[in-house]
């Protein structure tokens, strides 16, 4: 399935149905009064987050959504039928923004969450509505009220517990394929990964988390270099970032700083998130090289550095346990926050 994380769509709710002019006509009743009914309400445009979608690709081909008009009123004071709503289904994690791409309308971050983007127009009044003591036979009926219309942007930020960041060829896709059932494209050249990948990491029957792999960053990504930094949005919701560094590539300190600078340039609070620094591809280094590069990286970052090999699996399980600790802590904090809000 192709991946698309941004889309612009046009939405318009239904117009209200028209009221009608009608008079009661029955045998033996010479002067039947007005009995024209009101129009029905137009359909709403509703957007709902569903759990079984992970891309906005459908909106590349369908970009206009219009709800139907309400039914017109009828004689015998009958109100027109209300029009059905149009339900637009989007992946969990979709944000809806105004046409300026800056103003947030809604963040559909949990399954079943929905928002009414455009409300249908009210139906117009039939002539029975205008009957009064001074006007016994009104010949007036209103048109239905027009529906609302707007252009909006949909922006998908995937829901993952942990995110993989690093330069191209750092081994992120290999790591994801080893620790989960995901099968991303893997090759020995930069930018093999062109869009985010998700995998579920299962440590036990009770312990699992979702891991996101995003395309590699290069220097100047926040200014549009390479694939840019647009995919960093997919790790904004993560509880912890796994910063993978290619230990066999040479200057590991420069590699770490490059990605950190790009995250700072992007913003979004990424640099405030817990970061696990991982020196990957230890199978391609001598023990002396691995020790020296680990020490240099620890000195530059001021953090503990984990050494692993995504190919052989060395050091992977302790790393996953460390990630699970952060994820469990984040889930508990979120649970407490939600229980406090509901109380």
Curated annotation (Swiss-Prot):
Biological process terms in GO annotation: ribosome biogenesis
Function: An essential GTPase which binds GTP, GDP and possibly (p)ppGpp with moderate affinity, with high nucleotide exchange rates and a fairly low GTP hydrolysis rate. Plays a role in control of the cell cycle, stress response, ribosome biogenesis and in those bacteria that undergo differentiation, in morphogenesis control.
Catalytic activity, EC: 3.6.5.-
PANTHER family reported in the protein's UniProt record: DEVELOPMENTALLY REGULATED GTP-BINDING PROTEIN-RELATED, MITOCHONDRIAL RIBOSOME-ASSOCIATED GTPASE 2
Keywords linked to the UniProt accession: Cytoplasm, GTP-binding, Hydrolase, Magnesium, Metal-binding, Nucleotide-binding
SUPFAM superfamilies: Obg GTP-binding protein N-terminal domain, P-loop containing nucleoside triphosphate hydrolases
Subcellular location, record wording: Cytoplasm
The protein's name: GTPase Obg
Similarity field: Belongs to the TRAFAC class OBG-HflX-like GTPase superfamily. OBG GTPase family.
InterPro entries hit by this protein: G_OBG (IPR031167), GTP-bd (IPR006073), GTP-bd_Obg/CgtA (IPR014100), GTP1-OBG_CS (IPR006074), GTP1_OBG_dom (IPR006169), GTP1_OBG_dom_sf (IPR036726), OBG_GTPase (IPR045086), P-loop_NTPase (IPR027417)
Gene responsible for this protein: obg
GO molecular function, one term: GTP binding
């Amino acid at each position: 399935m192709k991946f698309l994380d941004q889309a612009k769509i046009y939405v318009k709710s239904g117009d209200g149905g028209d009221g009608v002019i009608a008079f009661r006509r029955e045998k033996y009743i010479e002067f039947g009064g007005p009995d024209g009914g009101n129009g029905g309400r137009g359909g709403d445009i509703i957007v709902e987050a569903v759990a079984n979608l992970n891309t906005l690709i459908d909106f590349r081909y369908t970009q206009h959504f219009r709800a139907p008009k309400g039914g017109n009123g009828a004689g015998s004071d009958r109100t027109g039928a209300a029009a059905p709503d149009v339900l637009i289904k989007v992946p969990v994690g979709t944000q809806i923004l105004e046409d300026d791409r800056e103003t947030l309308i809604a963040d559909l971050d949990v399954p079943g969450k929905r928002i009414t983007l455009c409300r249908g127009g009210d139906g117009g009044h039939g002539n029975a509505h205008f009957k009064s003591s001074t006007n016994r036979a009104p010949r007036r009926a209103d048109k239905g009220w027009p529906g609302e219309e707007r252009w909006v942007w949909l922006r998908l930020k995937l829901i993952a517990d942990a995110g993989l960041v690093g330069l191209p060829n750092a081994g992120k896709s290999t790591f994801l394929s080893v620790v989960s059932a995901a099968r991303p494209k893997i090759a020995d050249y930069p930018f093999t990964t062109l869009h985010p990948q998700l995998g579920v990491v299962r440590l036990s029957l009770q312990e699992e988390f979702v891991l996101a792999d995003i395309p590699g960053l290069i220097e100047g990504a926040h200014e549009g270099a390479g694939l840019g930094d647009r995919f960093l949005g997919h790790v904004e919701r993560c509880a912890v970032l796994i910063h993978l560094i290619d230990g066999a590539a040479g200057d590991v300190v420069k590699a770490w700083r490059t990605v950190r600078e790009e995250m700072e340039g992007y913003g979004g609070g990424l640099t405030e998130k817990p970061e696990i620094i991982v020196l990957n591809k230890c199978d391609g280094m001598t023990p002396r090289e691995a020790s020296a590069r680990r020490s240099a990286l620890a000195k530059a970052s001021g953090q503990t550095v984990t050494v692993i090999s995504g190919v052989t699996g060395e050091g992977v399980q302790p790393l996953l346990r460390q990630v699970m600790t952060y994820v469990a802590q984040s889930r508990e904090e979120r649970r407490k926050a939600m229980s406090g809000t509901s109380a």
